[in-house]
A protein has these predicted regions:
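Core segments of cupin and vicinal oxygen chelate
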Residues: 2, 12-61
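Vicinal oxygen chelate
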Residues: 2-4, 9-13, 94-137
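Eukaryotic phosphotyrosine signaling hubs
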Residues: 8-9, 78-82
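Short amphipathic alpha-helices within nucleic acid-binding modules
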Residues: 21-24, 90-96
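A short beta-turn/loop motif at secondary-structure boundaries
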Residues: 40-45, 73-75, 110-113
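Exposed loop/turn and edge beta-strand positions of beta-sandwich/beta-sheet ligand-binding modules
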Residues: 47, 79, 115
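Short hydrophobic/aromatic beta-strand element in the GNAT-like acyltransferase core
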Residues: 50-52, 84, 118-120
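Short, solvent-exposed aromatic-acidic interface loops
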Residues: 70-74, 135
Length: 137
């Protein structure tokens, strides 16, 4: 492995209500709760709660998405990150987004030069997601 390579990737989304957002991401994207952590944020000394989500049932070094709540900070209002998800059925995912309190931003569109169909949406707290389905070759 190269010195700058990494074995896995995790993303932390700062949220207002980690439980509500956990329910949303599990229902829409099929993720599972693999761990819950709370306490003081290490060297920062701030109270926090987080729920770690993954595609498996345990922390196995794979990719995770963490719903992270700083308990004493003002809640985020601006877009800090765009979460990207790849799916086999973008139309079905669109229905799940709406059914679970998300908001669709425009119609599904094709970017044939990139070989994808794309749908932008917001989760119930307004975080932006880019949802992609690969086009058949």
């Amino acid at each position: 492995m190269a010195d700058n390579a990494f074995a896995s990737l995790f993303t932390k989304l700062i949220v207002d209500d980690e439980e509500k957002m956990t329910d949303y991401y599990c229902a829409v994207y099929g993720l599972n709760v693999v761990a819950r952590v709370g306490g003081d944020a290490g060297g920062m000394g701030e109270p926090f709660r987080e729920v770690i989500l993954g595609t498996g049932e345990a922390m196995d070094g794979g990719q995770t998405l963490v719903m992270f709540n700083f308990l004493d900070r003002p809640k985020p209002r601006d877009q800090q990150v765009i979460l990207g998800f790849v799916t086999d059925d973008l139309d079905a995912l669109k229905a799940k987004i709406v059914a679970n309190g998300g908001k669709v931003l425009g119609d599904i569109f094709e970017q044939t030069d990139h070989g994808v169909r794309v749908l932008f949406a917001e989760d119930p707290e307004g975080a932006l997601t880019e949802n992609v389905q690969m086009l058949a070759h």
